[in-house]
Amino acid sequence: MAVDITLLFRASVKTVKTRNKALGVAVGGGVDGSRDELFRRSPRPKGDFSSRAREVISHIGKLRDFLLEHRKDYINAYSHTMSEYGRMTDTERDQIDQDAQIFMRTCSEAIQQLRTEAHKEIHSQQVKEHRTAVLDFIEDYLKRVCKLYSEQRAIRVKRVVDKKRLSKLEPEPNTKTRESTSSEKVSQSPSKDSEENPATEERPEKILAETQPELGTWGDGKGEDELSPEEIQMFEQENQRLIGEMNSLFDEVRQIEGRVVEISRLQEIFTEKVLQQEAEIDSIHQLVVGATENIKEGNEDIREAIKNNAGFRVWILFFLVMCSFSLLFLDWYDS
């Protein structure tokens, strides 16, 4: 079981500081030094990895803030009719789509480049694990931002489809309004004629007598404009046909809407799979590089073994030759 010795450590440090003061030893740049040398952090060379990783995270965060800031303007399909969100056009939305896709692709390439350089550099196992964890975190952050963008784009496409469907279902101008406008034009034309011809003002009774027969004929013609049963039946059939066409168009729009949402979901899955495949390709590349290095080391070991075996054979041959000469010398000496 672990024991807390913090108080003992502090007491020991205080004792050492008191003893150094009594002996007049300068600690931490003098008696009034800001910190002891014991607690000073050793100078550690800072690499380029941390700054580049922070830069990538900053860029991804800026993209996320931009998407959230312009979310209402981006997903709103009725900006031309609403003054509150009338600050963005369809061209600007398309430009945002293009820039966001390029930006996410660039960030993904930067992450893969950092991962490759981190594998190439020679560091301890702890530093490698730390950098791998940092890159995994950045990649997960980028995936979440990509998911946010995909959701916003799907909502925008869905609203555009709804807008087109509603525009197709708008009613045509009423015939009554046409008649009212035509009657207004007719009523305005006599007034203009009266202004242009002031001589008619001197004969109001004659004008009234001329207009009354016209009103009578108009009233008689109103009765003649009533529809016959055959015409009513024909118009009902035409209405049924139009309703059927509208229903079929509505079903097609719903199918297209579902397909668009499905395409956006598949695009998101495809993006995740592509990122996973890139990570797997990098790992396979590292394994291939490691296998190549192992093969080189094995070839060098084989060469050394061949050299050692050749030297060993030379020594054995030398020993046998010397033994043969020794036997011949002894045989000659005995004879």
UniProtKB/Swiss-Prot annotation:
UniProt topological domain (Cytoplasmic) ranges: 1-309
Bias-annotated ranges (Basic and acidic residues): 168-182, 192-208
Mode of membrane association: Single-pass type IV membrane protein
Distribution of this protein across tissues and organs: Ubiquitous.
Gene Ontology CC terms: endoplasmic reticulum; endoplasmic reticulum membrane; Golgi membrane; SNARE complex
Sorted UniProt keywords: Coiled coil, Endoplasmic reticulum, ER-Golgi transport, Golgi apparatus, Membrane, Protein transport, Transmembrane, Transmembrane helix, Transport
Residue ranges, annotated region (Disordered): 168-226
Subcellular localization: Endoplasmic reticulum membrane; Golgi apparatus membrane
InterPro entries per UniProt: Syntaxin-18_N, Syntaxin/epimorphin_CS
Entry coiled-coil feature ranges: none
PROSITE patterns assigned: SYNTAXIN (PS00914)
Signal peptide residue numbers: none
Ranges per topology, Vesicular: 331-335
Membrane-spanning segments: 310-330
Gene Ontology MF annotations: protein domain specific binding; SNAP receptor activity
GO annotation (BP), single: regulation of Golgi organization
Source organism superkingdom: Eukaryota
Annotated t-SNARE coiled-coil homology domain residues: 243-305
Subunit (UniProt): Component of a SNARE complex consisting of STX18, USE1L, BNIP1/SEC20L, and SEC22B. RINT1/TIP20L and ZW10 are associated with the complex through interaction with BNIP1/SEC20L. Interacts directly with USE1L and BNIP1/SEC20L.
Function statement: Syntaxin that may be involved in targeting and fusion of Golgi-derived retrograde transport vesicles with the ER.
Protein family membership: Belongs to the syntaxin family.
Annotated protein name in UniProt: Syntaxin-18
Gene assigned in the entry: STX18
